[in-house]
Amino acid sequence: MFAQELEELWDYFGDYAIRISHIGSTAIDGLEAKPIIDIVVALKDLDDFDNVSHKFTSNPEYSIKKDFDNDEILVRKGGERNRKFYIHVMDIDSKRYRDVIFFRDTLLHEEEIRNDYRDLKHILAKKYPHNRKQYTAHKADFIETTLDMVWAKTTLGPILVIAGVSLITSIIALWARFSVPYSAEFYRLRVRDISRAGIFFGGVIFLTTILASVVLWWRYHNAKKHYKEIVAKNKKELTKGQYKK
């Protein structure tokens, strides 16, 4: 189904579409999902949708809903009782698009998070079968916490590498400043000026990256703490009879 719809969407959007991707639970093996496929279409500019919207409005299978709160245009295919696709049209440079792709990739590559998300969806489906607002709110809390946690963790590593390199640069510059003997006055002064700049800029970068690392660690710590609280609550709920799998 996805491959067929993908081909049709490329025909509809043409060069306005930069990327079309399968997202949502149906894109992840092992996750419970409704038989509705979520697709995201990334445009260079969301306003470009106006150039192709007539192709959807002229087809009775499609209906359009502009969701400016989420920076997207939602195109639904199929009727209320026979919904087939949710097509999320977004600006490729928007935070919303980056978050959607990042969360999908996290579920694809992080088995523990994928399993925790599966348990959450199972509980919410049973707990709020007719309350879409509550279901979405609880799921959004998990997604936002996961994004914050994983982003901070993956960013912290490169920041620490930069801190290490800048520290080594400062040490080498400091050593050159005071330890390298030069007989010619010109070369001595040149090395002194270069080493002074190396010490200064290396030190500034080191202190900046250390400060950024502390902020990232604190952000990761808080997100991880909240994530564990959500997971612990889920595990407790799963022991109850009405929520058991």
Residue ranges and their predicted role:
Residues 61-95:
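Conserved catalytic core of two-metal-ion nucleotidyltransferases
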Residues 167, 192-216:
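Canonical hydrophobic alpha-helical transmembrane segment
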Residues 95-151:
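Catalytic cores of NTP-dependent nucleotidyl/adenyl transfer enzymes across multiple folds
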Residues 29-48:
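Catalytic metal-binding acidic patch
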Residues 176-199:
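Interfacial non-cytosolic loop connecting adjacent transmembrane helices
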Residues 218-245:
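Short, intrinsically disordered, charge-rich cytosolic tails of integral membrane proteins
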Residues 148, 152-170, 175:
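Juxtamembrane interface helix immediately N-terminal to a transmembrane segment
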